């Protein structure tokens, strides 16, 4: 008899619990019905507040498969052994997450590359861009500042690359402050000082990699772009030293103005956090007050224009001399120039890992003074963006480089192709799932 009474008592208790659960479900459904009735009005108000633009899913949207019952509450707060309350989503529960949620993916970061082209630099610029696109992985937006007569030529060449989905570009005229345009245009080379004004012109761009037209990428742009993550809280830009060996350095022997570090820095490859550059107040030797980027350039030029030789690069050296904490210095292999080999090899990092970015200044791509540099340039200039063309690039190039061993730079030709071979192998010979 007692056994039957226990069974009856257990049944009554279960029935009572079920009744309570049914009432709770009814209350929740009524509350949800009221909330659903309010949601369209809230969505319209949000849309109007945003100016009537279709901005996609708003903050109030439930997302894929997400119902109105969901709250941002961890499953671990609730009893996981039976079932979830009706107003809680199992965000941390694998069986609910697997069916109710898509993975939240961050939009792929876009890299920004800038170049300034004037005169006969069209072909050099196109070759540089080709080298950047061959290996890059993330989307690349190129900002091209060029003389007006070059714009149509750039459009003709670059529009033929429209099949590259991860590449787009913007063309800009050469632009200087109207009250001092002639002074800036005459500084060093035509248009060279344009790079100083990039943080002021590209106000919507957070970070930027500036390169000269005579630069060739031998590994993905992504890799130098990742150096931004290594900046500390005070650093706003990154460059390589002008020289590794002080005995052949220019700044430490001839400069008539302040310069950064032991041998100065070279601005042909310059990585910038432009948001920080625009915000920073720079120490200087013209006034006790610190000046922002847009305010310091002209006073700096007026004070030192009779003492500088390399134009805007000298001005950058002066600025970072007074603000050394703001500069991140990367190794010479990221800006490898003839100076690193014409007096004997003096870039240890390139000897160990190869050249990452080749910088053919001194016009070495177009004369016979440094045939190793010219061979690299011509190989990439003649290479198409087709995969087969890139794969077949290496062997003919190595044969050409072997012909240059009578020169100092040619003697170390293997460092020119060491990283290039690795980049080709990683980009084109690795199965997509392993990249």
From Swiss-Prot:
Domain of life of the native organism: Eukaryota
Transmembrane annotation, as ranges: 7-29
Uppermost EC category: transferase
Signal sequence segment: none
Glycosylation sites: 168, 232
Organism: Rattus norvegicus (Rat)
Function: Glycosyltransferase which elongates the O-linked glucose attached to EGF-like repeats in the extracellular domain of Notch proteins by catalyzing the addition of xylose.
Principal cellular location given in the protein's record: membrane
One GO BP annotation of this record: O-glycan processing
Lineage: Eukaryota, Metazoa, Chordata, Craniata, Vertebrata
Subcellular location: Membrane
All ranges on the Cytoplasmic side of the membrane: 1-6
Family: Belongs to the glycosyltransferase 8 family.
This protein's GO CC annotations: membrane
Gene3D superfamilies (UniProt xref): Spore Coat Polysaccharide Biosynthesis Protein SpsA, Chain A
GO MF, one annotated term: UDP-D-xylose:beta-D-glucoside alpha-1,3-D-xylosyltransferase activity
Encoding gene, per UniProt annotation: Gxylt1
Record keywords: Glycoprotein, Glycosyltransferase, Membrane, Signal-anchor, Transferase, Transmembrane, Transmembrane helix
Inducing or repressing factors: By E2F1.
Stretches assigned to the Lumenal side: 30-435
Topology relative to the membrane: Single-pass type II membrane protein
Name of the protein in question: Glucoside xylosyltransferase 1
UniProt-listed Enzyme Commission number(s): 2.4.2.42
């Amino acid at each position: 008899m007692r056994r039957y009474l226990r069974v009856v008592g257990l049944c009554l208790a279960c029935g009572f619990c079920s009744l309570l659960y049914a009432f709770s479900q009814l209350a929740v459904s009524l509350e949800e019905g009221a909330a659903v009735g309010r949601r369209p009005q809230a969505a319209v108000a949000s849309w109007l507040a945003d100016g009537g633009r279709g901005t996609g899913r708003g903050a109030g949207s439930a997302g894929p498969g997400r119902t109105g019952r969901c709250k941002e509450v961890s499953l671990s707060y609730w009893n996981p052994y039976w079932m979830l309350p009706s107003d809680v989503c199992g965000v941390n529960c694998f069986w609910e997450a697997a069916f109710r949620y898509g993975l939240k993916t961050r939009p792929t970061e876009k890299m920004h590359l800038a170049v300034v082209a004037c005169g006969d630099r069209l072909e050099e610029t196109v070759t540089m861009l080709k080298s950047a696109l061959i290996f890059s992985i993330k989307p690349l937006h190129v900002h091209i500042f060029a003389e007006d007569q070059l714009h149509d030529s750039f459009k003709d060449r670059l529009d033929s690359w429209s099949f590259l989905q991860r590449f787009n570009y913007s063309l800009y005229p050469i632009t200087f402050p109207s009250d001092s345009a002639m002074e800036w245009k005459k500084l060093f080379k035509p248009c060279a000082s344009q790079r100083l004004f990039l943080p002021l012109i590209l106000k919507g761009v957070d970070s930027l990699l500036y390169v000269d037209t005579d630069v060739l990428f031998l590994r993905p742009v992504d890799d130098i772009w990742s150096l931004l993550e290594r900046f500390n809280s005070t650093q706003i830009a990154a460059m390589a030293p002008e020289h590794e060996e002080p005995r052949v350095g220019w700044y430490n022997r001839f400069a008539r103005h302040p310069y950064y570090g032991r041998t100065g820095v070279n601005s042909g490859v310059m990585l910038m956090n432009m948001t920080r550059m625009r915000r920073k107040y720079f120490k200087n030797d013209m006034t006790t007050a610190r000046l922002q980027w847009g305010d310091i350039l002209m006073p700096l030029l007026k004070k030192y224009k009779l003492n500088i030789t390399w134009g805007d690069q000298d001005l950058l050296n002066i600025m970072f001399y007074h603000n050394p904490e703001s500069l991140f210095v990367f190794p010479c292999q990221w800006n490898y120039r003839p100076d690193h080999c014409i007096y004997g090899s003096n870039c240890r990092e390139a000897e160990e890992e190869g050249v990452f970015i080749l910088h053919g200044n001194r016009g070495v791509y177009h004369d016979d003074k440094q045939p190793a540099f010219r061979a690299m340039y011509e190989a990439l200039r003649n290479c198409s963006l087709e995969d087969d063309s890139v794969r077949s690039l290496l062997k003919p190039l190595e044969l050409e480089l072997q012909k240059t061993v009578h020169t100092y730079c040619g003697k170390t030709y293997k460092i020119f192709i060491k990283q290039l071979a690795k980049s080709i192998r990683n980009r084109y010979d690795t199965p997509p799932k392993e990249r």
